Amino acid sequence: INNNVGGHGPSTDGIDIDSSTNILVENCDVDCNDDNICIKAGRDADGLRVNRPTENVVVRNCIARKGAGLLTCGSETSGSIRNVLAHDLIAYGTGTTLRLKSSMNRGGTVENIYMTRVEADSVTHILSVDLNWNLHPAWTKNKYAGFTSNN
């Protein structure tokens, strides 16, 4: 998957999973300008109203080239994200391997994120957490819990 490679377009994610259950992403090679594989669950007041989580996600045997993050949870977290297993991944030059982001107006819970067997080459950060990624008035609070990284 190539999305705006070498360009400067904003929000050019490679793969977006939003408000979905029982998802498998495997054998992908992603090169983009933003989040390579991004897990979301609704945005702001509308996301809180619908309140549909993303849960039971497996990401395996994938490569990420450049981009902001190999695996990103958020920033759209209103419906909650839980039970994500990511393994046997390679990051070449991404900003981070695991990127967690939300904002005070998004709310939701992000929990039970498990990453193992991740290879990182020329990656700026292994973990990036930004709980106030986009400054707006608060609708509700977010909660983060249960993260495991193992190599």
What is the predicted role of each segment?
Residues 1-151:
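Extracellular/periplasmic carbohydrate-active domains that bind, remodel
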